[in-house]
Amino acid sequence: MKDSVIRKLEGLLERNEEVLALLSDPSVIADQERFRALSKEYSQLEDVVKSFTAFQQATEDLEAAKEMLNEDDPELKEMAQEEMKEAKSVLETLEDELQILLLPKDPNDDNNAFIEIRAGAGGDEAAIFAGDLFRMYSKYSESNRWQIEVMNTNEGEHGGFKEVIAKISGEGVYGKLKFESGGHRVQRVPETESQGRVHTSACTVIVLPEIPEAEAIEINKADLKVDTFRASGAGGQHVNKTDSAIRITHIPTGIVVECQDQRSQHKNRAQAMSVLSARIQAVEDEKRRSEEESTRRNLVSSGDRSERIRTYNFPQGRMSDHRINLTLYRLNEVMEGVLDVIIEPLILENQADLLAALAED
């Protein structure tokens, strides 16, 4: 391992000890905000510290085995060779592990997320597929013990959704779901199709990290236009007699957010502001990325939300992710929420891309 990497790891080890000492400091314990921030940092350092400590131990074992080679006893020499072989194998594994742990982390990976699914080309069939996608993500959330809370729906005339927005809360939600942003295409025979012809329709999925209140960008109230209206259900009928639904327009960006799934106007407004904050933050992040972008671009992109990323072919039972040329004939499982078979390869491909970028630098 390079000396520069070793020095960086030693620095993280020292920082871990500092943070541990600070967490037992009464003045830090009294300051809840600082205590939470340090607790989070300590948790983030845990894996790299554990791996580097094991790496240091394996390095010592290797040096001790090398010294044993100088012994005259043939049995000790043989033992030393075995120990050297084992230590080298452990070091190789730990070096790969540490390289991954040192990769730049998306600060939002541990955050909750908002997921927005919109029917695109394909009319009723696109809306039905949007409903299928929402069910798929709901099943995946359940398997991870995440909570899913519907914030806004616009139901399709023959089932599904023209649009559905939900908040998913739990550990590492955004880090797992962020690569789902993009165009999702479906190829299947609609139930209403009498000739058995395969139709193609599409949906767009957007995944945004929830921005913690302390980190949220400040939104000027003068930049907001707030409208209230009656919440409506399927077919457009009004489902209550009070103006509990909220529509907020952010005038500078033109972003519009509607929330009507809560009975309380206050709750709908709070949820709408939360989604608005996430969308504005996403616009700012995209602008910054565009300014910083070099010729190199990540293979697995969570940025271009209009790009077609995946095809679900029902007649063939096939799911293809076009970003990493992954094809699986496990469509029924995927639609039942078995998504790690797609998500894990995407995460690994992203890590490989980041490693390649670091090597170039």
UniProtKB/Swiss-Prot annotation:
Name of the protein: Peptide chain release factor 1
The UniProt record lists the keyword Protein biosynthesis: yes
Family statement drawn from the similarity comment of this UniProt entry: Belongs to the prokaryotic/mitochondrial release factor family.
Region (Disordered): 283-305
Sequence ranges of Basic and acidic residues compositional bias: 283-296
PROSITE patterns in alphabetical order: RF_PROK_I
Name of the gene encoding the protein in the UniProt record: prfA
Entry keyword set: Cytoplasm, Methylation, Protein biosynthesis
Subcellular location: Cytoplasm
GO MF annotations, alphabetized: translation release factor activity, codon specific
GO cellular component, one term: cytoplasm
Function according to Swiss-Prot or TrEMBL: Peptide chain release factor 1 directs the termination of translation in response to the peptide chain termination codons UAG and UAA.
Species name: Shewanella woodyi (strain ATCC 51908 / MS32)
Source species, domain of life: Bacteria
SMART domains: PCRF (SM00937)
Claim: Protein biosynthesis is one of the keywords in the record: yes
PTM entry text: Methylated by PrmC. Methylation increases the termination efficiency of RF1.
Listed InterPro entries: PCRF (IPR005139), Pep_chain_release_fac_I (IPR000352), Pep_chain_release_fac_I_sf (IPR045853), Prokaryotic/Mito_RF (IPR050057), RF-1 (IPR004373)
Modified residues (N5-methylglutamine): Q237
Pfam hit, one: PCRF
